[in-house]
């Protein structure tokens, strides 16, 4: 049977000027084979908690996953992590609002600067998060040349687009 795992770890990082994110579980009627992942690590900058959650509507699948995770000792968490997880989601709203405003300002600055000052490179305006996709095809460089350019001349380490597929 096919299972769909929907990684929603960035779901809360949507800019106020964009459409709110709709989790996959709210869009499909048959959730029998759906697993949704969430975590406060990105939203509330709490990766040190080492805690995330799986939403598994199907009780059989939930039991099977619990058995696998128990066998690998992956369901052990400490009270500090659980408290931080809950506190982030219960009381982190004001902090998240400030974070999104800060990230939106950075997004606007980066997109404006790249699109006006860097010929051959086009920045896409993201709807959320802290990542920006750059279209560098206008530079006319191979993937290897592009990587060398960014690392050695621009002093910026990047995830090369080619690792996401031919269209980069």
What are these regions (language model features)?
Residues 1-168:
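PLP-dependent class I/II
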């Amino acid at each position: 049977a096919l299972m769909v795992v929907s990684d929603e770890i960035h779901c809360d990082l949507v800019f106020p000027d964009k459409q709110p994110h709709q989790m996959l579980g709210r869009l499909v009627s048959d959730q029998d084979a759906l697993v949704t992942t969430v975590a406060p690590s990105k939203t509330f900058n709490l990766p040190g908690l080492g805690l995330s959650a799986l939403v598994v509507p199907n009780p059989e699948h939930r039991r099977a996953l619990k058995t696998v995770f128990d066998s690998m000792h992956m369901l052990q968490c400490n009270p500090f992590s659980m408290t931080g997880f809950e506190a982030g989601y219960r009381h982190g709203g004001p902090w998240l609002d400030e974070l999104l405003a800060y990230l939106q300002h950075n997004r606007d600055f980066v997109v404006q600067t790249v699109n006006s000052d860097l010929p051959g490179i086009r920045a896409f305006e993201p709807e959320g998060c802290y990542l920006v996709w750059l279209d560098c095809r206008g530079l006319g460089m191979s993937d290897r040349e592009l990587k060398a350019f960014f690392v050695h001349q621009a002093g910026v380490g990047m995830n090369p687009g080619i690792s996401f597929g031919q269209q980069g």
